[in-house]
Swiss-Prot record:
RNAP is composed of a core of 2 alpha, a beta and a beta' subunit. The core is associated with a delta subunit, and at least one of epsilon or omega. When a sigma factor is associated with the core the holoenzyme is formed, which can initiate transcription. Signal peptide: none annotated. Transmembrane segments: none annotated. Keywords: Antibiotic resistance, DNA-directed RNA polymerase, Magnesium, Metal-binding, Nucleotidyltransferase, Transcription, Transferase, Zinc. It comes from the Bacteria. DNA-dependent RNA polymerase catalyzes the transcription of DNA into RNA using the four ribonucleoside triphosphates as substrates. Zn(2+) 1 binds at C60, C62, C75, C78. Zn(2+) 2 binds at C818, C892, C899, C902. Mg(2+) binds at D449, D451, D453. Its cofactor is Mg(2+); Zn(2+). Binds 1 Mg(2+) ion per subunit. Binds 2 Zn(2+) ions per subunit. This is DNA-directed RNA polymerase subunit beta'.
Amino acid sequence: MLDVNNFEYMNIGLASPDKIRSWSFGEVKKPETINYRTLKPEKDGLFCERIFGPTKDWECHCGKYKRVRYKGVVCDRCGVEVTRAKVRRERMGHIELAAPVSHIWYFKGIPSRMGLVLDMSPRALEEVIYFASYVVTDPANTPLEKKQLLSEKEYRAYLDKYGNKFQASMGAEAIHKLLQDIDLVKEVDMLKEELKTSQGQRRTRAIKRLEVLEAFRNSGNKPSWMILDVLPVIPPELRPMVQLDGGRFATSDLNDLYRRVINRNNRLKRLLDLGAPSIIVQNEKRMLQEAVDALIDNGRRGRPVTGPGNRPLKSLSHMLKGKQGRFRQNLLGKRVDYSGRSVIVVGPHLKMYQCGLPKEMALELFKPFVMKELVEKGLAHNIKSAKRKIERVQPEVWDVLESVIKEHPVLLNRAPTLHRLGIQAFEPTLVEGRAIRLHPLVCTAYNADFDGDQMAVHVPLSAEAQAEARILMLAAQNILNPKDGKPVVTPSQDMVLGNYYLTLERAGAVGEGMVFKNTDEALLAYQNGYVHLHTRVAVAANSLKNVTFTEEQRSKLLITTVGKLVFNEILPESFPYMNEPTKSNIEEKTPDRFFLEKGADVKAVIAQQPINAPFKKGILGKIIAEIFKRFHITETSKMLDRMKNLGFKYSTKAGITVGVSDIVVLDDKQEILEEAQSKVDNVMKQFRRGLITEEERYERVISIWSAAKDVIQGKLMKSLDELNPIYMMSDSGARGNASNFTQLAGMRGLMANPAGRIIELPIKSSFREGLTVLEYFISTHGARKGLADTALKTADSGYLTRRLVDVAQDVIIRETDCGTDRGILAKPLKEGTETIERLEERLIGRFARKQVKHPETGEVLVNENELIDEDKALEIVEAGIEEVWIRSAFTCNTPHGVCKRCYGRNLATGSDVEVGEAVGIIAAQSIGEPGTQLTMRTFHTGGVAGDDITQGLPRIQELFEARNPKGQATITEIDGTVVEINEVRDKQQEIVVQGAVETRSYTAPYNSRLKVAEGDKITRGQVLTEGSIDPKELLKVTDLTTVQEYLLHEVQKVYRMQGVEIGDKHVEVMVRQMLRKVRVIDAGDTDVLPGTLLDIHQFTEANKKVLLEGNRPATGRPVLLGITKASLETDSFLSAASFQETTRVLTDAAIKGKRDELLGLKENVIIGKLVPAGTGMMKYRKVKPVSNVQPTDDMVPVE
């Protein structure tokens, strides 16, 4: 057997007839499959045992030889070799065709490869191959031309005229003869000459032909192999036939298609032997051609062959194509053993790294381990009795199971797995019942809730797999989100609410101003009802041993609340005492204003101090991030568990519920509504008098009602008591927001109709008062649209992720430093005056390209190639520096991937990225996963041109697919000055730009908004009108860097507007993949063809080679490809074929004799090899473990 891990590369090519015969173990002569009485395969049929091997292990067809001792014997009676039955999965047969037939992929594909080689149109080819016309194969010395088509009538006339001097024939035989006559070298030389002189259409045709002919010449494939003399028959186990319960047979469609070919082939042989008239033979040959076409790609030409019930049969091509094809169904996504699935329920008692596995599930999953352990412990004599013990579920089995699962992590996965946190490892604990218990804090990462979600469990078997699961995938390790480096395991809902309630402060609460010696004393007072959790009290600062106070602070009294004392118990040692929700308190120390000299009047001081806000969800997140930064993983995960327990405990104790009485009705509501109504009446009056247009009237009415709702919302929030449960829920960040509250207690406001236009009649009632029938009806539109949008969005977002993963799957950190001297200039990302992304956010975790100095003192803040961390980034910003040169994936020189320096910090771990990290896939997941949070809508602002800007998911797709954007902006192609702006006819305006050399004029629609005025100085690529730039246009007039930065800026803009943060480096990796190709304009003295697409790396290598010999290099221009196009243009044919357009990719690859170097992840998964990322990289595979223990002297037994 081939060892899959020793593959270097994989080749694909055309098979010669001899090659096909060498694969075969015998010729299939009969269309029979299985004998209906004996149920044994028929001899020489499609399932023949003599050709394909025995159906039963070690047993020949006639039964003369049985048992393994006859291994390798060929039976003298039935001719079957005695061997394993699984050879029926790998042995092929063949059919000798009575007449050559063409391969439909090469004749029918676009462009037709056969047509390009022969320089004939596909139309002409079709006429010849399907016996409609003759083609002249050898004109001899007649006036006919080679490859000329003749109809039946013309052929007869020429035969009468010239006799047998010339040769013309029809069918694939004729094409075969023409293909054999082609001299590749001569043709290529002629075409190269033609290229030098020709223009336009002829030139493009020549380039296309040259590409195909060069491919044949270089790959060693012969053009005549596109015509088949012999047809391979795939192994029978890959097209099985099985008996169903009713005695009927279920069979693969391929068997039907093969049977048609064999029947027609045998009939043709018989007709040829009988010497039948040519018209009958021709008809039979055409039918054979059609049968082979249907077998290879049914439905590609003419009507597809159908089976019972008019269903088209699945041909060989269909077996590979699409989601259900071989690539995506069986090679890239396999079903695995040692897995289970069940409903999840919450496990609040679990530790961060644990999950609860139902007992019976665990027993089934760990069965082999339990059996081994039972035998080792002597509780069973052999494996068989151990198995019996497990099946009978004897009591000792449970004890053994307990010890087996200890420290054996399992993987939990929730579909849809949108990012890498959708699969994490946990240590199992056994639980009763049949549901999996999940830790509440990992729900955010899985996007799981407990309303019936299910999860799958997988068991890592080998020691290496277990080690990887424990070290890399354990839930306690995955605290940061790979997309932005922020903690993903922040408490939510009840936990937030509990901690919020615990840290509330109230003026004048029971026992305010009491002084305590230490925390225990304060808690005792609380338990006995002398103080409340929210009471502000004083505690001796020196009693809080684990907290960092300054020496001065230690000697004083600390003003805090009882709840905050409890909250601070969960924080790690030497962390500042959290007394107010501010950045300085988290990062530096507790502010001095909370400390009193001993003996001061505590009550009086407390009475004067303002109330501090409680700790909301955001603050909890910041505390976690700071703890992670200081104390790393282990301490953070322990602290998270403590925070979770505290939150649950106090949200239970607080007993926060929602009742109708909590929804306070606003008294002023009626007045506000009446005032708004009178404003609307005014507007209507103006409209009726003709003072304003319909459009203006609509706009004003909408804005009046929006303003009224805002006023109500503002007043409502002010009128709420801060202990109102609904207010607490929304303020703490547990659930809900101000808008929900306004709808409950104020008014519902304006709604949109099904078309998305806002209805100008607002819903004046709130849910508390109840809606009228009309109002209820209007509300239903929005609800329905919301549900439909969500469903569509999920599918769109998933498909976007799939394309992103595909284009970047081979981007891996391949080396430490690529040695580039280029970088990008990082500035804050701005949209107008608003900053989308601050400079420090762009700098953190990146390597500096150039030294950064303080502009005033000249002090070096960061050296070249030094990592910029949070502190350094802050120093740079505080020094007033506005732009910094940093290393970037855009400018990295590593051929297939990125280097450590250009990538920077790994956001998921907060430390340097390792060589072998699959950063491309992480980037794709980071961009795709928030896709579902983006909106679907295109904003329409009442038909103002240039304002219908696409946003949300459609805009992201538009950018990554490099499509022409909606509402496209006009850009200038020259540097210069705007000299005039004129109105021209047809509602257009003309902008005239005068440059140093030439003057250009641009027209824009009359109502589009201009971004320039007369007299403005402008540079190439600058926008003249509002809207989105077409990046392809931008690439034509500016350089690569401008386009890269534009795409980065636009993608970040969409996500940040929706409140989603994504690290720049992820977008950079994707944009880099879109700009990897160069279109060759002039080949110079290199071997590349003009007009071809080449990888930047291959292009520079080819030029380097030519320059070293002192010749002329090729010139090219960078090309921007959309992600789908870029995926299909990848060097790996396996990756491209498994993505989309499978047959086109494979046709092309076979002709070129492509070689897949197996550099990406997909290719290796397909052939079943370890992926070249992480520990699968060759660098790590070659590491040999060496014992570092010194050998000791021989042990001496102690007497």
